[in-house]
């Protein structure tokens, strides 16, 4: 049985990509395509809604869907920790709906953010440089915001990072005390560098999205999770086996137990590097 999908923001790049993936899948059926200014009532009747609109529009789309008992997959930037906490309060007690918020559908990007979160405990000088195509309106990106927030959480008692001269505009926007610098230019799909400065060394965790195909696996994974989600789920990392515990559980299962498919291929359309100088 297929799951019907309504895409809000279907005319944008991500909306077009998600629509193509849905139409090509045997698991899902596209039943409504709305632009960011479309009538939200047009998505009613679908099993799940996908919001890939604009930061100023996204919250209204999600609230409308939740109010009508629809699960929502959110791929729009601008969902800060404060907005997510507010959303969690709104749907507390409503066990019938779920909202899955994915700042970045790229598996490589999620891994790079996880590596940065690990490194944040060991360095006090940290900055983020992110780049996207010239058509991306908002800045900093949702990925950069989530990376900064997760690194800040990981630092715990170490407190805020060292960020001198942040009163100067060229020093970037501070997110969770971490300076973030945003580039918007032609020829770029998506790129993020997290730079850590230490005593006599610099560590850079870098991820480049080279083609939209980098998002396909993550989009399908998120769509599947949205079907049965309850409450608020944030990040692709919540949906994949980040620490290998699920795989180990499968390997130790009794003989004859069913195991999931194994993909030995690396993610397409992306490149990740960790460098230390």
Swiss-Prot record:
Binding residue positions for (S)-2,3,4,5-tetrahydrodipicolinate = 142-143
Tell me the route in metabolism or biology where this protein functions. Amino-acid biosynthesis; L-lysine biosynthesis via DAP pathway; (S)-tetrahydrodipicolinate from L-aspartate: step 4/4
Can you tell me which residues the record assigns to a coiled coil?
A: none
Could you tell me the Gene Ontology terms of the biological process aspect for this record?
Answer: diaminopimelate biosynthetic process; lysine biosynthetic process via diaminopimelate
The residues responsible for catalysis, as annotated, are 132, 136
Name it.
4-hydroxy-tetrahydrodipicolinate reductase
Summarize the protein's role. Catalyzes the conversion of 4-hydroxy-tetrahydrodipicolinate (HTPA) to tetrahydrodipicolinate.
Q: One Pfam annotation, family name? A: DapB_N
Show the taxonomic lineage.
Answer: Bacteria, Bacillati, Actinomycetota, Actinomycetes, Micrococcales
Under the heading InterPro entries, the entry gives: DapB_C (IPR022663), DapB_N (IPR000846), DapB_N_CS (IPR022664), DHDPR_bac (IPR023940), NAD(P)-bd_dom_sf (IPR036291)
Q: What Enzyme Commission number(s) appear in the record?
A: 1.17.1.8
Is the NADP keyword given for this protein? yes
Q: Which GO terms describe its molecular function?
A: 4-hydroxy-tetrahydrodipicolinate reductase; NAD binding; NADP binding; oxidoreductase activity, acting on CH or CH2 groups, NAD or NADP as acceptor
Going by the UniProt record, its keywords in alphabetical order are: Amino-acid biosynthesis, Cytoplasm, Diaminopimelate biosynthesis, Lysine biosynthesis, NAD, NADP, Oxidoreductase
